[in-house]
């Protein structure tokens, strides 16, 4: 069986290096190992079943799902949010014609090549991105650590592929970090309004994560202002002017 790391074997990160007395972030490009490629393949095969188990719905109450090959109505929903981002970028005078993989009609973005968009975003983390199989671990492994144990697994997949003898954190602790357990729980106190932003170039995680949170909230009748700012990375400036307008509107 061929292995192509789901078409994206290379990843680039920005580790901090101390140069004289100034800390600079220097880009480093690497290629995933064969083993990481197999893990990527296995996780990709598992993901559609997870998405489909959430039973997410769009604005017209259509169920959003993924097919085994990663296509489907859930991906199409995310694509529509990306097109909204492109439309706003055009209004903000971005030269969107420089991207040959975007389709236009009367100078308006109407579609794009999904794989080219993924290439444009690039991969930042090797697989698995969060629950590592061994040392040195990830910040997330350490979040789930204890007073005695630095790193603990928080997924069955990470635990099954463990190389460092890390234990698996109890399920009740994992639950505390997952808002999906509480959004539909009538006993949980939720904010009345949410504003969620995920940059089009935010590679720290997938756009699927913010999309899942948005849809889960909306499916439980909680208003969400969701947008994907173009040309924006992780912790970017998500337009504070719009933020203050949103606050004003929900507090009137």
State where each predicted segment sits.
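Short beta-strand/loop motif that positions the catalytic acidic residue
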Residues: 195-198
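Catalytic histidine neighborhood in serine/cysteine hydrolases
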Residues: 192, 218-234
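Extracellular/periplasmic catalytic domains that process cell-envelope and extracellular macromolecules
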Residues: 187-190
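Acidic catalytic loop of the alpha/beta-hydrolase fold
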Residues: 200-205
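Short, highly selective alpha-helical patches that border small-molecule cofactor pockets
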Residues: 206, 210-214
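Accessory cap/linker subdomain of secreted extracellular hydrolases
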Residues: 2-185
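Catalytic active-site module of serine/aspartate enzymes centered on a nucleophile-bearing elbow/loop
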Residues: 239-252
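Short N-terminal edge-element motif at the start of the domain
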Residues: 208, 238-239
């Amino acid at each position: 069986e061929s292995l192509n790391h789901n078409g994206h074997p290379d990843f680039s990160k920005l580790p901090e290096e101390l140069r004289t007395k100034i800390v600079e972030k220097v880009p480093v490009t690497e290629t995933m190992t064969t083993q990481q490629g197999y893990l990527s393949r296995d996780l990709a095969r598992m993901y559609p079943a997870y998405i489909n188990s959430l039973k997410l719905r769009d604005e017209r109450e259509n169920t959003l799902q993924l097919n085994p090959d990663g296509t489907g109505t859930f991906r199409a929903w995310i694509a529509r949010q990306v097109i909204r981002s492109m439309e706003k970028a055009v209004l903000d005078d971005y030269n969107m014609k420089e991207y040959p993989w975007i389709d236009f009609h009367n100078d308006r973005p109407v579609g794009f090549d999904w794989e080219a968009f993924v290439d444009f975003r690039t991969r930042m983390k090797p697989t698995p991105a969060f629950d590592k199989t061994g040392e040195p671990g990830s910040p997330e492994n350490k979040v789930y650590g204890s007073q005695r144990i630095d790193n603990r697994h928080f997924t069955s997949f990470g635990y099954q592929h463990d190389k460092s003898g890390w234990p698996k954190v109890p399920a009740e602790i994992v639950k505390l970090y997952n808002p999906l357990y509480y959004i539909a729980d009538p006993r949980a106190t939720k904010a009345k309004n949410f504003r969620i932003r995920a940059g089009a170039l935010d590679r720290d995680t997938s756009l699927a994560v913010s999309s899942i949170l948005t849809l889960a909230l909306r499916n439980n009748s909680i208003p969400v202002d969701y947008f994907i700012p173009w040309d924006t990375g992780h912790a970017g400036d998500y337009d504070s002017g719009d933020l203050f307008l949103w606050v004003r509107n929900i507090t009137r």
